[in-house]
Amino acid sequence: MRHSIRRGLTVASVAVVSALALSACAGTASDPGSTEDFEPLTSIKLQLQWLPQAQFAGYYVALDKGYFEEEGFDSVEVIPGGGDIVPQDVLANGDADFAVAWVPKVLGTLEASGAELTDIAQVFQKSGTLQVSFTGDGVEEVADFEGKRIGSWGFGNEWEIFAAMAAEDLDASGVKITTQDFSMNALLDGDVDAAQAMTYNEWAQILETENPETGELYTPEDFDVVSYEDTEGAMLQDAIWADTARLDDPAYADASVRFLKAVTKGWIFARDNPEEAATITYDAAIAAGEGGAFPVGPTHQLWQMNEVNKLIWAGGGFGVIDESAWAKTVKGALAAVNQDGLNLIMDEPAESAYSNEYIEKALEELEADGITVDGEYTPIEVTLTKGGQ
């Protein structure tokens, strides 16, 4: 069953595909470094890493507000992901034009498969990963992981843990990495000593849960939190990836710039209007039906929007890849060794693994139109409620 929401956005509960049918083509950006004539692309697909939630608000806002239409696209599909969907594989197989995925996950895929993909915009400038334990359980820093049950979702999300451990000379064999689901139940049920969480999702989930000892919601003071952003294992996360070989095609390169312009406008709107952006994303999650991300309550989505903005807007231009942060991510990926003694990567990635050429062109054109493309985010106050409703 399909449910319609604003501007023709649709989300299928099984296929979970968001689509926007737009009108006539607008002006296009020129391909960086090419003046060759070409027929502009007007139809594209974007593969997300996860289900509809404010982690991806900028893309849903761009759909809702017509920003893709403004950049000359007739049809845009935003395809939500899930635990069994690997965005970089979808992109490499030609089933999407662009994909959103964490940098270390893609680096591992590139080395293992020989695929060639390029990070053309680094949406998240900071790591949002946490390791959360109950206060007093003795897990206050990465060095405390030794001998503990450390929860992780797997699916490539665990490598930041191993990178942080490697920086502390902590052997993975001395830590029990325990698979947890995409909730905080493993911590609440005592199955792990510290659970993996994102600042914008699972951390809110546990603060939306009632403490059985008090009858009130848990508070931050009930927990010790290790933020990977504050460790040497911090890695770059949500990035927009393109097909490296196709970037030699002037039509695809041009579409990449126009796509990034629309996405940038979406994220700028989400920064300046977090409440409305959260509502737009909530509508998309509701339209996804039972396949929607858990939990999809409006208060939870507003919390998520607030926290995601903190990861994106670090003061520089939107989406620009910081060379030092990239180098730190690569260093962590090279050092990370899992509990089975396997490395994430053994060699430095190719130079083509990232490029600022396309995002810088997009920002330049937006600035020429009078749009401010950099800045910091001023957080709003969000009061969590039970279940995020």
Positions of PLM-derived features:
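Pocket-lining segment of extracytoplasmic ligand-binding domains
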Residues: 182-185, 192-289
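Short, low-complexity disordered leader/linker segments with a strong preference
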Residues: 1-42, 363-389
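Short helix-capping segments at alpha-helix termini
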Residues: 67-71, 168-171, 211-218, 288-292, ...
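Short, glycine-/small- and polar/acidic-enriched structural segments
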Residues: 32-180, 185-189, 193-197, 226-228
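Short, solvent-exposed loop/beta-turn-alpha elements that line the ligand-binding surface or hinge
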Residues: 70-72, 142, 218-233, 249, ...
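Secondary-structure end/capping motifs
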Residues: 250-341
